[in-house]
């Protein structure tokens, strides 16, 4: 998905779309309101881009750890385009003196519904030919809690898609979503996430405090089933009870990787004296958002909707400040992209 095409007077996004088409993406992305490449097409496209970089004299290093040495690298010009999950790089660069600051972000669960239900909500009663012409339906929903002001919203909605285990550290688990180009899976999924404030994890005390919180939640998710993706029905989440093979509803999970049924309620639950105690309002806020979305999409809050968790990495919890010349406080080091906290989302 390449949806964020706003605030782009210089045509950078158009350049990227044309580049993807040149490496195998469907030309329809040049005119679609919500252009979508597809994970399967993207793999081939990135491979072609990599080969072109190498043909032009560039080097690609796999299975290689990035390190920064203030003495060794002081005269280099480095574009730092790390992703928001490059936690070891954040830690090393912070120790080297790179200025960083905590920021607000959002976390939650990946929620699955039947794609046919979403299509019926969006298109109404249409014949099969019309439905095929329209393609799998996509939604975007938002809600602001009247109780605490937190936002609840959908993120990275994947029509006809799959939930994937996107963990990158031992003993921790996080999920994401994806769609193949055809978007022909049985389920629709999206992250339904709740805003996380810097004050929730004492971001003023340490700029990497958000990463520490992410790790805590991912460890809890991992421990539920020993690394398998934990799944719970929305009805059981509301009732604060475990989902089992016997109690799961009619929606079959569409998950790439191993999964099992469990109970997600305690992932965001903390003792009253915990520095994360303010997150005890997460579950109630999540439910409030789901019930609000029911008024926009009938069946969204159905009892057998499936929650998978935890979705902890929707955006970077860190920003690397930079000047008008885009340079950081370290001369020659230019942070950009999601890992720098300036570009994020879909």
Regions found by a protein language model. Name each.
Residues 1, 6-266, 270, 274, ...:
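Residues forming the flavin
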């Amino acid at each position: 998905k390449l949806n964020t095409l706003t605030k782009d007077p210089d045509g950078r996004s158009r350049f990227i779309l044309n580049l993807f088409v040149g490496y195998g993406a469907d030309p329809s992305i040049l005119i679609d309101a919500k252009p979508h490449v597809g994970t399967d097409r993207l793999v081939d496209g990135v491979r072609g881009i990599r080969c072109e970089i190498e043909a032009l004299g560039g080097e690609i290093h796999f299975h290689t750890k990035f390190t920064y040495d203030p003495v060794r690298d002081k005269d280099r010009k480095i574009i730092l385009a790390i992703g928001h999950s490059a936690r070891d790089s954040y830690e090393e660069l912070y120790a080297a003196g790179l200025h960083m600051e905590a920021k607000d972000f959002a976390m939650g669960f990946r929620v699955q519904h039947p794609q046919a239900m979403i299509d019926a909500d969006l298109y109404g009663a249409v014949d099969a030919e019309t439905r095929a012409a329209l393609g799998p339906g996509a939604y975007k929903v938002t809600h602001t809690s009247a109780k605490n002001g937190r936002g609840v919203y959908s993120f990275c909605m994947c029509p006809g898609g799959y939930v994937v285990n996107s963990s990158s550290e031992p003993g921790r688990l996080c999920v994401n979503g994806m769609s193949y180009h055809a978007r022909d899976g049985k389920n629709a999924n999206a992250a339904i996430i709740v805003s996380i404030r810097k004050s929730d994890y004492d971001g003023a005390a340490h700029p990497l405090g958000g990463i520490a919180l992410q790790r805590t939640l991912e460890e809890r998710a991992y421990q539920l089933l020993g690394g398998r993706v934990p799944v719970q029905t929305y009805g059981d989440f509301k009732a604060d009870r475990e989902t089992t093979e016997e109690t799961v509803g009619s929606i079959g999970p569409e998950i790439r990787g191993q999964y099992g049924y469990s109970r997600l309620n305690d992932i965001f639950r903390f003792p009253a004296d915990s520095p994360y105690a303010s997150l005890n309002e997460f579950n109630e806020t999540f439910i409030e958002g789901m019930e609000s979305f029911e008024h926009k999409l009938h069946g969204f809050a159905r009892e057998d909707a499936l929650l998978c968790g935890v979705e902890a990495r929707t955006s970077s919890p860190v920003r690397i400040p930079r000047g008008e010349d885009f340079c950081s406080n370290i001369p020659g080091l230019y942070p950009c992209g999601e890992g720098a906290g300036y570009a994020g989302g879909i």
